[in-house]
Amino acid sequence: ARAIRVHGKLEPIYVETVAELPEASRLYTVRARCERSPLCVCRWRKFHHISAWPLSKTLDFFQNLDLGGNKQQIAEKVLKEITERLGFLINVGLNYLSLARSAETLSGGEAQRIRLASQIGSGLTGVMYVLDEPSIGLHQRDNDRLLGTLKHLRDLGNSVIVVEHDEDAIRAADYVVDMGPGAGELGGAVLIADTPEKIAACEQSITGRYLSGKEAIYIPAQRTPKDAERMLVLKGASGQNLKDVTLELPLGLMTCITGVSGSGKSTLINDTLAKIAQRDLNRATKDEPSPYTEIQGLEQLDKVINVDQSPIGRTPRSNPATYTGVFTPIRELFAGVPVSRERGYNVGRFSFNVKGGRCEACQGDGVLKVEMHFLPDVYVPCEVCHGKRYNRETLEILYKGKNIHQVLEMTVAEAHAFFEAVPTLSRKLQTLMDVGLSYVRLGQSATTLSGGEAQRVKLALELSKRDTGRTLYILDEPTTGLHFADIALLLEVITRLKGKGNSIVIIEHNLDVIKTADYIIDLGPEGGDGDGGGRIIAQGTPEDVAATAGSYTGQYLSQVLANSQTAAV
């Protein structure tokens, strides 16, 4: 048990290296022969060659595999099983993955779709399947395939329940249960449960108002044109499946990086551009960027901020109040009340990170961790402070009739009204409300925030700062887990950041975000290695990309632009 605990603590600093076997093959003596497939440059293929191919290429190989004579007859059932299962994986949008891909490198959405493909292959009936946002990370083309797969599961005689924000998924459903009316304490009720058409006709449903077009995310009346003098140029990007890509990124604009899954978006932006900028601007030395030859224009920026969906903290002590800097002035207010001064309490008395005012039984966590060894750890409320984090003496100090625990239990909206007369607090709390987090509690544990909520807390922190207008913000699918109304709020925040002169780069599949961009860089045409992806196939305004032949993003974008309303000037 002790060894397991030690391994868990050391795991974050482990480095994975390729084993020194011939071509890192793992199993390098197994061979398969294919005489007809044009993919083969020789008659024999080693097992590790096949497992390293994209699934689409692997499927083509097995479909054309000719073993000859009775060997073909013996292998027929096995080959049928292999091709069917590969087909299921491709139909859920995973054509760019390889069989050798390590499970720990898969995103949550990819892992979920692999499990979905295995269920389709099992052919079970009478099963209830529950999926939580399966569209995460999927291009619109792959999303259509996914919806077809879910309908196939239903047609087999199963029940399919999907928690989803995607408009196409909602419209494709047989039955929709809409929760609300708001988020957090303002939600929790079933507003309406009916067909998508009935949902769209429901005035009380925010989802329905967006489905009916009464509420909408508008196309901007005027897009910010690119300035040829303000360009960031990255040359020779060749990491993973990138084909010697030259990226010309206009600064001061909102730029969307698009393309089907596996086309190289994350490699180009997260693994190459972001790491170069973090190394050269932020003086970060942790990670080396993927291969490239040259970068020009970084002198026009002073820092890069990667606003991702990673947690804002990994312990119960981390919360929105501590992350955004709201907690320090709150503690100063409590330390300044007359009773605190009489007792000699300073600001540290109201911290749950140091001894003095905190509950020592739980060391200010409010909960106790129970290690389960082979299962996720369980947190139970502290029996001494009952989750209040502080000792009795500290909780006796009141500010405007509330103790420190009661303030941390307030929602952002309640705290904004409570501290309205304190400009420092009011301004920071307003930014949290601006990004749609009015329902979150100030002291809510970081471990309970979703990825989308954590990302918006980070955006709120950036909004509250005074900046120089020379910052590069990188966001990777910020719409994950967001409702239409939340996306509208997110776009308002991004517009404010851009309005200060900053540059925004967004890796995104959501067409409502893409259509509002000033500039689009589309990668593809397909995903994976070989001739699949890794090239820039279209760039320009959304209208330019929509008119580009051969761009899947352009095909879907043209339909959205034709059916969307333009904002009033």
Curated annotation (Swiss-Prot):
Annotated localization: Cytoplasm
GO MF entry, a single one: ATP hydrolysis activity
Keyword Metal-binding: yes
Keyword Repeat listed: yes
Zinc fingers (C4-type) by residue: 359-385
Function as written in the Swiss-Prot or TrEMBL entry: The UvrABC repair system catalyzes the recognition and processing of DNA lesions. UvrA is an ATPase and a DNA-binding protein. A damage recognition complex composed of 2 UvrA and 2 UvrB subunits scans DNA for abnormalities. When the presence of a lesion has been verified by UvrB, the UvrA molecules dissociate.
Protein name per UniProt: UvrABC system protein A
Name of the gene encoding the protein in the UniProt record: uvrA
